[in-house]
Amino acid sequence: KQAKLFNVKNLVIINKKSFEKFKEKNNNNKLNIYNDFESLSKIFKKKIDYTMSSIIGLDGLKPTLDIIKYTKKIVIANKESIVCGWNLIEKELKKHKTKFIPVDSEHFSIWYATQNKKNNNLDKIYLTASGGPFLKRSMKKIRLSDALNHPNWKMGKKISIDSATMMNKVFE
């Protein structure tokens, strides 16, 4: 749906099953579908303006590292890749002169605050949190279904558990 909505010309789907399924359903001559990032080198004469990296968990780190050389700016919505692989990401960013913009709210706020030359003398940054949905409940009485039941939206199991247990704050 998004590829059609934004008139995407090139799409990379790394997961082989998803790639085959999508390609079968979208036999559109206007859309080039690839199964690896190396294929992009064949079609790009110059760098892409923006790339969004939003694969959940550490699965997003390798594709993020692979695409950096093909893009002017990489927008990363994957906090696990930033936290666990920042030294690798930063090395590739410098090597390929690619700009970085984090999308996750806490990472974006910190990044944005440090972009202002007046704020370059920051010593500490404090990240606050509500305490989560189980702050005043006994852990013995909390069930898996409680943690998976987000009151506002469906986020999938991993993100719901990370949110309910405050693990997302560790990554942030």
Regions found by a protein language model. Name each.
Residues 17, 81-82, 107:
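Conserved beta-strand edge residues that scaffold enzyme active sites
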Residues 73-74:
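A short hydrophobic/small-residue beta-strand
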Residues 104-109, 152-172:
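Mid-domain beta-loop-alpha active-site segment that forms a flexible
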Residues 1-58:
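N-terminal glycine-/serine-/threonine-rich beta1-alpha1-beta2 phosphate-ribose binding loop
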Residues 14-15, 77-79:
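Short beta->alpha connector loops at strand-helix junctions that form conserved
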Residues 53, 78-79, 166:
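A generic secondary-structure micro-motif detector
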Residues 38-41, 62, 108, 171:
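Short, contiguous clusters of charged residues that form electrostatic/catalytic patches at enzyme active sites
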Residues 46-47, 54-55, 61, 65-70, ...:
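Rossmann-like NAD(P)H-binding beta-loop-alpha module
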